[in-house]
C-alpha cells in the first residue's frame, strides 16, 4: 500500500498533507484537494491515505509524547518533515496494521 501502479506513494501524499496542515491549512480542505487531484487512486489507497492523515493529525499530541520519550531531539526542535515522518511511523505502528 505504499506505491500504486501510477507510481504515487500514499505515504508521501500523507506527509504532504501533514506539512500543509502544519503551515496552517485546514486538514479537511487539504485532504479533499489531494483526493481530488489523485482521484485515480484505488479505494483502498484513498482509505489508507485518509486514515493515516486524519489519524496522525488527531493524535498529534500523543504521538509527539511517544516520540519525545525515545528521541534526544524534542519534536518541537525537529525539522517539520522529520517530525511528520516520525508521527506517521508511530501512528502506523500503534494504530494500523500496515
Spell out what each predicted region is.
Residues 1-98:
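Class I Rossmann-like S-adenosyl-L-methionine
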